[in-house]
Amino acid sequence: ANMKYFDKYGLELPTNYDELKEVCKTFRDNGEYPLVIGAKDSWINIDTWMNIAADINTEKLYSAIEGETPFTDEDLVQSFQIWQNCFTDGVFQDGALGVGMYTDSTDMYQKEGSVPMILNGSWSLGAYMDSDEQSQEVYNGEGANHKIFLMDWNNDGKIAPVEEAVDVSLAINNQSKVKDAAWTFVDWMIHEGADTLVNGQLQYMPARNDMELNVEGLNENGTENLEYCVEQGKNNVGGYREMAYAELKETISNELTELALGDVTPEEAADTIEAASQAQER
């Protein structure tokens, strides 16, 4: 969230869906954007739905993905309902399905500073270190203040957990004739290299618990947000971000779009996804 908009209209960061809906209404009433999502991109739709579902019942979400709980379960149907409500309640911006995240949506938030809120992952913290002049002004200019926050989607008093994924993995070829040299490089990447990518460039979240965070050139506001992300990544993890089942994932993506368009009900979407789940080889 870009806090200059919240300060301008005397608003607090929303902590649950009902508060989010009211904040978005206030922004809309004053000619501002509500919560921005690049819903043309399936990955952000799936990320958001999984966050909603994990907030309602983490165990059932991952059990359903593995084919052990039906997607027609009432908790999962509720997750589809909340996703659809984000469009019908005006939480997401008008025309969200027609714009992507990168860079249609991210430029408005990161470079123009023209939207109050955006849905994105912890990697967006890299904007604090972006050499682009517009980003520098938005994130490091006088009075700049941004906050990363999680949502209580079902208004039960508990914020959603985060989902995590491996972004880059390193491996040594079993047939290599220079395994020792390869390991030297891998070991460097895990330690000195990782320190450069995190503390020198803020390109990734730290994967090592023993890494001391001291990002060069990161302002106080950025440091606060980084510490928040690291804390959530350590102590509030729902599960994995990337599901292993391509056909099921595609069906979920399609149904999330249909829900956003209002062409299906949450119950109908659940039926379609459950059929795909039953047909999915695991």
Where are these regions (language model features)?
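Periplasmic solute-binding protein
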Residues: 1-15, 21, 32, 38-65, ...
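A local structural motif
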Residues: 8-13, 68, 85-101, 113-114, ...
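Extracytoplasmic/periplasmic substrate-recognition and gating elements
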Residues: 9, 133-203
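Short helix-initiation/N-cap motifs at beta->coil->alpha
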Residues: 17-22, 96-111
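Glycine-centered hinge/linker elements that transmit conformational signals in sensory
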Residues: 24-26, 66-97, 147, 151
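Alpha-to-beta junction loops
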Residues: 31-33, 111-120
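Short, solvent-exposed loop/beta-turn-alpha elements that line the ligand-binding surface or hinge
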Residues: 56-78, 133-141, 152-161, 212-220, ...
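Long, aromatic- and glycine/proline-rich binding clefts that accommodate carbohydrate-like moieties
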Residues: 146-150, 199-254, 258
